[in-house]
């Protein structure tokens, strides 16, 4: 595009462009062309303006009745408003300009050489940013000491933090770079920036961040925004999902001029913020909907998991109950087999029933718990344990039982105990030749 623009220039304009670049040492051809256009291709006025700007001396020419305003057309996405310096007027002005021109060129050439050499010896201390917040707060304090407390609300944070907040809040961010050595900075701050109408306008429409270019943080931002002169204001906003400079205001402006230009930039770019806000709301709604769907899915998943857990728990409980029932059944069957084996063993070990006419015969009738009667003969000399073993060997006898006499009622000690280690004989127990004994079930005791 630069080559196309150069082809659009006349031969005379091209020669002036190259001559101006040689005199000022500006590397950017676009900047040289812009400066010449601001001065209506008056090379003497353009060179004088550039030298005055670098030197920081007061203006030597009177202000014109109307300040020419320039719009940067190199990039149609960025609106540029530049207040150009006045051209020399009259013989006195041109005479002073022509006399001072060689001295200024020599002075600034030597100054540039000195600065270039000094850069290798001692790097610019502003290039090291160690406390960006401190730089901003320090500038605010110095600003209020010099210009008072009536001013737009300064963002008390770093440039990066201001960018992030403007992005998050979808607001315009106005950046002011304060050139302390520039002759227009004091006038701008005192008579434009700190006026009530400008203060109210900025506070109600945008975030406002400012810093001096003499501070490391301000110098770093200056390197990024690449301002041409002071005062400098840059309007930044979220555009196409990136923080973009959409407006550049340079030079001394009156309050109403500043408000008009800021209003123009806002109105020209408001649709981008509205579009971004709608997209963000749509993304938020989509995110909320997705979150609600995820929550509903999680609720359903938890319900299914709880249902599955209860099902498994019920199955596990049923399995344990079945295993416990099987275990008890096996124990019961084993116990039953052991009892049957014990009954059979006791039956095999019983002494033979004595004959009816034996002199020591004892006839005993047992009344069982189920009401049946069992009769058998024993000998007086036999132990009561024989009676117990006989009853134990019977199928209808319960597992645990005791033998009780009818009158007087007493329990016969048929099994060994601590008190009676050896059970007595039938005779010692006081049984008669014909005896009725009761068998009591002790299984449930």
UniProtKB/Swiss-Prot annotation:
Parts forming coiled coils: 275-353
Subcellular location: Cytoplasm; Lipid droplet; Endoplasmic reticulum
Gene3D superfamilies linked: DNA helicase RuvA subunit, C-terminal domain (1.10.8.10), Glutaredoxin (3.40.30.10), Phosphatidylinositol 3-kinase Catalytic Subunit, Chain A, domain 1 (3.10.20.90)
Keywords: Coiled coil, Cytoplasm, Endoplasmic reticulum, Lipid droplet
Pfam families to which the protein is assigned, alphabetical: FAF1, UBA_8, UBX
Single annotated GO MF: protein-macromolecule adaptor activity
Domain UBX: 357-439
InterPro entries: FAF1_2-like_UAS, Thioredoxin-like_sf, UAS, UBA-like_sf, UBA_8, Ubiquitin-like_domsf, UBX_dom, UBX_domain-protein
Composition bias, Basic and acidic residues: 303-348
UniProt main location, coarse: cytoplasm
GO biological process, one term: ERAD pathway
Protein's job: Plays an important role in endoplasmic reticulum-associated degradation (ERAD) that mediates ubiquitin-dependent degradation of misfolded endoplasmic reticulum proteins. Involved in inhibition of lipid droplet degradation. Involved in stress granule disassembly.
PANTHER family: FAS-ASSOCIATED FACTOR 2 (PTHR23322:SF1), FAS-ASSOCIATED PROTEIN (PTHR23322)
Record-given protein name: FAS-associated factor 2-A
Organism, as annotated: Xenopus laevis
